[in-house]
């Protein structure tokens, strides 16, 4: 469950990594809601070109636009800098810097520098909604999303046309804040499509009545995530 994953994540952060801050440099995260970004524009000051690349993560195709720039000096080495235009539910990210923690609309946000290891370590500066980190739901609940939407919409009520108001909401940095959870421990559902060398598996509380075909399917999915070693945690003898 998400609740149990939260317990393991906090235990790993506090007792193994010695981290007490809510979010800090080096934290491993997992994106829990798709996020679309505007396509990048090449810098006019550099001799650059844009080309597209795709990556398939957990069955979802993520679009990354790579900006290839040439250093101004003749014969300089080309630098390829991936720029993500779509961040998928399930993508991994590593925190490089956290700043400007603030509260708006009853939610807490932070500006975070993130590195995405699945995309050649592309780096992005993003606004992250901190409330999603420890929620017991897979991401913000429908009620929370609706609350945020209504509060943001109020800021644009002076715009007469509804279509224009909605466009502003869709572009708003707080409404579009990236939703992430810690990625040290994740649910079996979230792990679908991925594999790791070593897996520590905790099935949680179980009774004989829970031994259904759905449980067998869950068990198969969980066991096949490991490519080398599978460790059973808190498993009944």
Regions found by a protein language model. Give the residues of each.
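Core RecA-like ATPase module of SF1/SF2 helicases and allied nucleic-acid translocases
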Residues: 2-236
């Amino acid at each position: 469950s998400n609740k149990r994953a939260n317990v393991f994540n906090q235990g790993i952060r506090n007792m193994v990594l010695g981290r007490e801050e809510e979010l800090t440099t080096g934290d491993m995260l997992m994106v829990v809601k798709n996020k679309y970004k505007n396509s990048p524009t090449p810098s006019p000051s550099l001799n650059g070109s844009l080309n597209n690349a795709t990556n398939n993560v957990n069955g979802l195709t993520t679009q990354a636009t790579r900006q290839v720039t040439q250093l101004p000096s003749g014969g300089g080495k080309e630098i390829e800098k991936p720029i993500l235009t779509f961040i998928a539910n399930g993508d991994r990210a590593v925190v490089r810097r956290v700043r400007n923690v603030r509260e708006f609309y009853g939610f807490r946000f932070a500006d975070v520098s993130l590195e995405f290891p699945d995309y050649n370590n592309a780096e992005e500066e993003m606004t992250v909604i901190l409330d999603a980190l420890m929620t017991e739901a897979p991401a913000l609940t429908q009620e929370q999303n609706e609350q945020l939407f209504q509060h943001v919409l109020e800021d644009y009520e002076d715009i007469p046309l509804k279509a224009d108001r909605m466009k502003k909401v869709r572009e708003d940095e707080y409404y579009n804040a990236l939703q992430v959870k810690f990625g040290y421990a994740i649910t079996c559902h979230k792990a679908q499509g991925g594999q790791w060398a070593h897996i520590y598996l905790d099935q949680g509380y179980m009774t004989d009545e829970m031994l259904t075909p759905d449980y067998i399917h869950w068990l198969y999915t969980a066991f096949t995530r490991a490519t080398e070693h599978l460790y059973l945690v808190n498993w009944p003898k």
